Amino acid sequence: MDKLNSTLTAVKNLRSNVRLCFEHLADGTDGESGEESRNKFVNDFQERFAAINSQIREVEQLINGLPVPPTPYSLGNTAYLAQETSQDRQALYPQLVNSYKWMDKVHDHSFLAFNNLNQNTLRRSYNYCSQKRQRLPFSSFNNDPDHIDKLLSEINTPPHTSYRIFRPFGTNAVTIVTISNVMKAAIVFKGVLIEWVTVKGFDEPLEHDDLWAESRYEVFRKVQDHAHSAMLHFFSPTLPDLAVKSYITWLNSHVKLFLEPCKRCGKFVVNGLPPTWRDLRTLEPFHEDCRNC
């Protein structure tokens, strides 16, 4: 390591003297045109040049005296840093070195903290607990396939609402809810939890092969957006049956979608649309702009 430091110091001195020599050549004479001034300039340059030659020989001797490593140093991907030319990427190497130093400090401090905590004589009750508390099973996904059929049959639905249940995805049910002659809604279940809702007009097809296609009517696309908001509002993994019943009740409130005026402005149509929003508690109709007023 001492030889390497001496070599680096010699290279540094050589570079400094070469820079001074070129600065001396760039400055030239003092402006005097006399023979004495020119001779002095030439003599100074020869002395500097001779000193540079001697330093070059010294650097060569020091380099030849360095021990050759048995194997090349493994730099990994950092070897590619020398190929970068842009200024914003050249600053990566010192940041990388600082990161490695920081990681080493974190490792050392963590090791010391681990040893100190192991030497602590205080005991906690959980150290002697032989059995861990087990989580309660999440049963909203693991229900009987006929549970949805029983659940929908228990809901007090008005006569204008009908249900049709099929299972194109195995045990998970898809329910087509037809609300009078107003609209249809396809509710995709995962267990007892509602995962997706598609709303279309009464005259539009809604089968298992087009559950993800939106309605061609803007009013039902708005109702579908509100249905997704209500789906998140009524979501309850702990009480999934109550969540489904509440959601179906909210969905049935659209039976008078085109017959009830807005509770705030009293108008039937605003911006070409009826009041598409139903309050989540009172089920009162509102226009989308009026509900935020």
UniProtKB/Swiss-Prot annotation:
InterPro entries tied to this protein: Mediator_Med27
Keywords for the protein's UniProt record, in alphabetical order? Activator, Nucleus, Transcription, Transcription regulation
Assigned GO CC terms? mediator complex; nucleus
Q: Where in the cell is it found?
A: Nucleus
* Sample GO molecular function, one term: transcription coregulator activity
Keyword Magnesium: yes or no? no
Q: Name one GO biological process term.
A: regulation of transcription by RNA polymerase II
- Top-level taxon: Eukaryota
Q: Which PANTHER family match?
A: 34 KDA TRANSCRIPTIONAL CO-ACTIVATOR-RELATED (PTHR13130), MEDIATOR OF RNA POLYMERASE II TRANSCRIPTION SUBUNIT 27 (PTHR13130:SF4)
Similarity-based family = Belongs to the Mediator complex subunit 27 family.
Q: What does this protein do?
A: Component of the Mediator complex, a coactivator involved in the regulated transcription of nearly all RNA polymerase II-dependent genes. Mediator functions as a bridge to convey information from gene-specific regulatory proteins to the basal RNA polymerase II transcription machinery. Mediator is recruited to promoters by direct interactions with regulatory proteins and serves as a scaffold for the assembly of a functional preinitiation complex with RNA polymerase II and the general transcription factors. Required for activated transcription of the MtnA gene.
Q: Relate the assembly described in the record.
A: Component of the Mediator complex, which includes at least CDK8, MED4, MED6, MED11, MED14, MED17, MED18, MED20, MED21, MED22, MED27, MED28, MED30 and MED31.
Q: What is this protein called?
A: Mediator of RNA polymerase II transcription subunit 27
What gene is this protein translated from? MED27
